[in-house]
Curated annotation (Swiss-Prot):
GO CC field: cytoplasm
Organism encoding this protein: Shewanella sp. (strain ANA-3)
Reaction(s) the record says it catalyses: (S)-malate + NAD(+) = oxaloacetate + NADH + H(+)
Family indicated by similarity: Belongs to the LDH/MDH superfamily. MDH type 1 family.
Protein's recorded name: Malate dehydrogenase
UniProt xrefs under Gene3D superfamilies: Lactate dehydrogenase/glycoside hydrolase, family 4, C-terminal, NAD(P)-binding Rossmann-like Domain
NCBIfam families given in the database record: MDH_euk_gproteo
Length: 311
């Protein structure tokens, strides 16, 4: 099993690489790529951790050596949010970065499962899909927008609010990965009820949690560590699915034939082909149905931005 992290010298990439070095199955290979010259050194640093995961780092303009033979590719390359920016402000820089990296993926490891972490995810996943289509290698079951951070935040905030064991909290988060497009289905959380006020405030907190971190770091960064953990959870789920483990389900932003938009975050069953099955997200409350329907123009606009960028 080979996992490649592109953008591995950044805040998310280093956290993700550390977690993968400690969690990937014995005998796995982990390759780190970043344009930054420090990247081989990050790999040397991590190589001193005593786990049976072989690690190599590559720097420079060309990610090809890191991508050769990769089963899973996780892309966190790009610029991070600063105070006053929203995820869409990142588009101008990150769109080109994702396009260029996916062009290399299309040539070097077209069958790999690809998880896009680089924001704005609503748009960068659409960019990746268009690039892969142009190259004639697009498989909608192998491309994912990583929205796991919205899920782990929801789990955490619900557990805190209700005094639950966080390990027992399961919640689907649907839609997209920015602002109003993030929709936690709180009505489905088992064993707990929320007042209308709690639903409204909790939903808003989950939607704005990225900004909460950006502001708390006061210009010193964005949500890198929690995102690293979220990306590791999702990456490990992809690996476990590839290895044939049963019942691996995660929410992700995918081209899953949704009635709502071309790309939509919902639960998917993972396996040897990536997505084995797109799962229904279940019954929703009136509040959730309204929030879902009113986000769609925003989401579709984000997707169109990505499609138009490549065309």
């Amino acid at each position: 099993m080979k996992v490649a992290v592109l953008g591995a010298a950044g805040g998310i990439g280093q956290a993700l690489a550390l977690l993968l070095k400690t969690q990937l199955p014995a005998g796995s290979k982990l390759s780190l790529y970043d344009i930054a010259p420090v990247t081989p050194g990050v790999a040397v640093d991590l190589s001193h951790i005593p786990t049976a995961v072989e690690i190599k780092g590559f720097a420079g303009e060309d990610p090809t050596p890191a991508l050769e033979g990769a089963d899973v590719v996780l892309i966190s390359a790009g610029v991070a949010r600063k105070p006053g920016m929203d995820r869409s402000d990142l588009f101008n820089i990150n769109a080109g970065i994702v396009r260029n990296l996916i062009e290399k993926v299309a040539v070097t490891c077209p069958k790999a499962l690809v998880g896009i972490i680089t924001n704005p995810v609503n748009t960068t996943v659409a960019i990746a899909a268009e690039v892969l289509k142009k190259a004639g290698v697009y498989d909608k079951n192998r491309l994912f927008g990583v929205t796991t951070l919205d899920v782990i935040r929801s789990e955490t905030f619900i557990a805190e609010l209700k005094g639950l064991n966080v390990a027992d909290v399961k919640v689907n988060v649907i839609g997209g990965h920015s602002g109003v497009t993030i929709l936690p289905l709180l009505s489905q959380v088992e064993g707990v009820t929320f007042s209308d006020e709690e639903v409204a405030s909790l939903t808003k907190r989950i939607q704005n949690a990225g900004t909460e971190v950006v502001e708390a770091k006061a210009g010193g960064g964005s949500a890198t560590l929690s995102m690293g953990q979220a990306a590791c959870r999702f990456g490990m789920s992809l690996v476990r699915g590839l290895q044939g483990e049963a019942n691996i389900v995660e929410c992700a932003y995918v081209d899953g034939g949704s009635e709502h938009a071309e790309f939509f975050a919902q639960p998917v069953l993972l396996g040897k082909n990536g997505i084995e099955k797109v799962l229904p997200y279940g019954e929703v409350s009136a509040f959730e149905a309204n929030a879902r329907d009113s986000m769609l123009d925003t989401l579709k606009g984000d997707i169109k931005l990505g499609v138009d960028f490549v065309k």
